[in-house]
């Protein structure tokens, strides 16, 4: 949309013209961060830059992760430095610019800006293979990141790629990432602080709080709102998380919570739970991920052992860029579909997520059934992800395989612009947590051993319906925590 004239009228009777066109912004890498600038021209009053890292913009409404409003040029340019922003070779910047020229406001959306294509003196490691003259403070050390870039003595090249790049060839079967949770390395794992945004899918939780480590296991345990903020009413209060919020799609909706009880905003999230990811520190394209975990038990709890897209290349709504579930088993000890099929914690699932709809989602999942709840013991869950298939296993036993061809589903025409495995042909990062309730993992009219699912999907008061049934589901939360022994990622054998 270069030179798009929005023509916001600041005086009655002023019309939008195309006499002014926003110049192409200059984006240059700094030693840490980057600068953005445009040349000054007569009549320019205000300039605003909005930048996202690895998230495209869908409109001019949302501010960027990094944003600034300038009222004065410097040395003939409107310029700003976004310092202390760690950039990696695989990152892509998205930029929209707003300029008040005379009495009209113009807005322009730039093309995606791969970091390695930017100007400036500096380059993240990985932009210039084999060039050791560049240094990058964002390149993770083996000690801090659990990356182990040691290749076998005889190396058969793998199709796996990692970000940040590790500076050596990646060999088949090579260990790329390992976390054993002897302690919680907060330089590696970033805590989410945000409200789920998608109203068609959103679980009934607020992501906040710190995950813990106990006896060599990561522990992620959901809490009731009353335990999280006893000073704030669940039905009539306001909470602004902006200073800590990690939301990037719509910070107003993801970072500022308010409730009016029976009003349109409903109640506060009934559940608050930690969630961590390697979004800022480690991502990979193709490989085998292994997670040894003990899944939670309790009605309407779902473990999140996920791979999520680093760059939402194919879109950012309705899972247009995909999500991969390494494994999940619902926390319910007994849960039946309307026609009697059991879908409780004795059923293990793994597969891609490409839709917010619970029925469509499960149609793509692979499953395995056993006589006891998967949360009774630790199990090793594995996903082998390559350029032509997804292979799911538990404790070394394969229970399902899915070949490429997702473009044939006609869910997103942009997938046809990618490779055969699109949308799963880009970098993905690791995300760990639990969700509770929501619309994506539980169809309507499910029944436990003693009561029917207490909320209706997409009902405006679904959270309230769930909360009001607390006396039914809370007594089942005997083991609500997700426990993880280790996470490992190996290069694929492809």
Swiss-Prot record:
GO terms for biological process: carbohydrate metabolic process; defense response to Gram-positive bacterium; immune response; innate immune response; innate immune response-activating signaling pathway; pattern recognition receptor signaling pathway; peptidoglycan catabolic process; regulation of innate immune response. Glycans are attached at residues 56, 81, 185. It is a lipid-anchor; GPI-anchor. Plays a key role in innate immunity by acting as a pattern recognition receptor for beta-1,3-glucan from fungi and lipopolysaccharide from Gram-negative bacteria. Upon recognition of invading microorganism-derived products, acts upstream of protease spz processing enzyme SPE to activate the Toll pathway and to induce the expression of antimicrobial peptides drosomycin, cecropin and attacin. It is found in: Cell membrane. The keyword Cell membrane applies. One of its GO terms (molecular function) is (1->3)-beta-D-glucan binding. Keywords: Cell membrane, Glycoprotein, GPI-anchor, Immunity, Innate immunity, Lipoprotein, Membrane, Signal. InterPro entries: BGBP_N, BGBP_N_sf, ConA-like_dom_sf, GH16, GH16_GRP_C, Glycosyl_Hydrlase_16. It comes from the Eukaryota. The keyword Lipoprotein applies. PANTHER family: GLYCOSYL HYDROLASE-RELATED (PTHR10963), GRAM-NEGATIVE BACTERIA-BINDING PROTEIN 1-RELATED (PTHR10963:SF60). Residues 1-19 form the signal peptide. Residues 135-494 form the GH16 domain. Residues 20-120 form the CBM39 domain. GO terms for cellular component: extracellular region; extracellular space; plasma membrane; side of membrane. Residues 126-160 are annotated as: Disordered. PROSITE patterns: CBM39, GH16_2. Its main location: membrane. This is Gram-negative bacteria-binding protein 1. The gene is GNBP1. Belongs to the insect beta-1,3-glucan binding protein family. Pfam families: CBM39.
